[in-house]
Amino acid sequence: MAHVTADMPATHATEHSITVAAPQAVVYGLIADVAGWPAVFGPTVHVDVLEEADPERGGEQLLRIWATANGQVRAWTSRRVLDPAARTVLFRQTVPAAPVASMGGEWRVESAGDGTSRVVLLHDYRAVDDDPAAEELIARAVDRNSLAELAALKEAAEQGELRDELHFVFSDSETVAGDAGDVYTFLDRADLWPQRLPHVSRLDLTEDEPGVQHMDMDTRSPDGSVHNTTSIRVCFADRGLIVYKQLKVPVAMSGHTGRWEIEPLGDGTVRVTSWHTVTLDPEGVRKALGPEATPAEARALVRKALGTNSSTTLRHARRFAEEARARA
């Protein structure tokens, strides 16, 4: 519940907390590893680390964060101060996104005894022009996201060593004798994928602001079944980079993020790589594959399914770019 501080009537403060059955070091490590947040926290879509802190001694970080709030994608720049010894992380938005005029706070990881931790998440914020409607909007977003982040942090930390089996990263690449811009165009224009890719049967794409795309896609499997996924993509044309986060994932997964990277090789070719970061859902694995299914079996099946679709997309992107160069 937000309250107004006595010394600054327009500044609101909130506190959320949760108890986690995991050591402080494990919990703090997940909070400190901000590049891994999209795989842990539901609201976080993507994080660019602009300035990095020393992982052992702490210090300041500068970040650019994209996250969902009240159903919309917001982007802002934040500075964090990490203190590994105290198990705290201070944060302050340096370039907020309207209707936020200012936003900051702190993560605290306290010992709760017997190898457990208490996590406290503090926020303070102001709305642009102290608008009451905006204050209510921000309050709802802070409350919803804080509860979601703490629950996700608890789940990830309490997985312990099992998390190493459930969480994995892989990639597929193609070398293209074409222009990076043409490869990017193919990947960016996902609205045309149903006409260009055999495994995409339907795709609705909206772009409310340049570079931020919402995708609702039906993918056809080799057995004829159709699977629906929804995603948010953040596109960086100047960097040859598209990152995405699936909001609706297949039953065996609890999370899936990825990125398309386009890298000029200097000899007239480019390397295009599709990266996937996947977290399996143990209960979902049992539902999808049977009660005796192991994480290793699920990893292999997910790797094959996602890798097959990515490789197909990469091959068609290569053909598109190479044919464009041949016509030039």
Give short role names for the model-derived ranges.
Residues 1-58, 139, 147-209, 328:
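Hydrophobic ligand-binding cavity/cleft-lining segments
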Residues 2-7, 11, 62-70, 75-77, ...:
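Beta-strand/loop substructures that line and gate deep hydrophobic ligand-binding cavities in soluble
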Residues 3-7, 35-39, 46-99, 191-197, ...:
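Glycine-rich portal/gate segments that line the openings of hydrophobic small-molecule binding cavities
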Residues 17-19, 48, 81, 108, ...:
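Generic structural detector for well-ordered beta-strands
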Residues 20, 123-125, 176, 219, ...:
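Hydrophobic beta-strand positions in extracellular immunoglobulin-like domains
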